[in-house]
């Protein structure tokens, strides 16, 4: 088995794809900045270290998720993220 690595936003977001015991996922890092992500599948995003400030589809307010916290994003939508410190995350896809 091999791992697939990806880079987005000029290398400011990097991830490594893997197959967990239950769902496919990625483990990644984000540099300081603001990003808009598109989803292809339902996502469970957990902050491993650092923090992500997120504006989910249909939301009017931003919400900050810290280490150990998880948010969910529907498939086939876009969501916005602000990163104030380099942050590690785990994303599982359903």
From Swiss-Prot:
Enzyme Commission identifier(s): 2.4.2.1, 2.4.2.2
Pfam families referenced in this protein's UniProt entry, alphabetically: Ppnp
Reaction(s) catalysed by this chain's protein: a purine D-ribonucleoside + phosphate = a purine nucleobase + alpha-D-ribose 1-phosphate; adenosine + phosphate = alpha-D-ribose 1-phosphate + adenine; cytidine + phosphate = cytosine + alpha-D-ribose 1-phosphate; guanosine + phosphate = alpha-D-ribose 1-phosphate + guanine
GO cellular component: cytosol
Keywords linked to the UniProt accession: Glycosyltransferase, Transferase
Class in the EC hierarchy, top level: transferase
GO molecular function, one term: thymidine phosphorylase activity
Domain of life: Bacteria
UniProt key word Glycosyltransferase: yes
SUPFAM superfamilies, sorted: RmlC-like cupins
Family: Belongs to the nucleoside phosphorylase PpnP family.
Function recorded in the entry: Catalyzes the phosphorolysis of diverse nucleosides, yielding D-ribose 1-phosphate and the respective free bases. Can use uridine, adenosine, guanosine, cytidine, thymidine, inosine and xanthosine as substrates. Also catalyzes the reverse reactions.
Protein name as annotated: Pyrimidine/purine nucleoside phosphorylase
Origin organism lineage: Bacteria, Pseudomonadati, Pseudomonadota, Gammaproteobacteria, Alteromonadales
């Amino acid at each position: 088995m091999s791992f697939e690595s990806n880079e987005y936003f000029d290398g400011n977001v990097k991830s490594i794809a893997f197959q967990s015991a239950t769902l496919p996922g990625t483990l990644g890092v984000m540099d300081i900045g603001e990003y808009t992500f598109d989803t292809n599948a339902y996502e469970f995003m957990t902050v491993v270290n650092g923090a992500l400030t997120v504006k989910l589809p249909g939301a009017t307010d931003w919400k900050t998720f810290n280490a150990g916290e998880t948010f969910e994003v529907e498939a086939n939508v876009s969501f916005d993220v602000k990163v104030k410190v380099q942050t590690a995350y785990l994303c599982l896809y359903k």
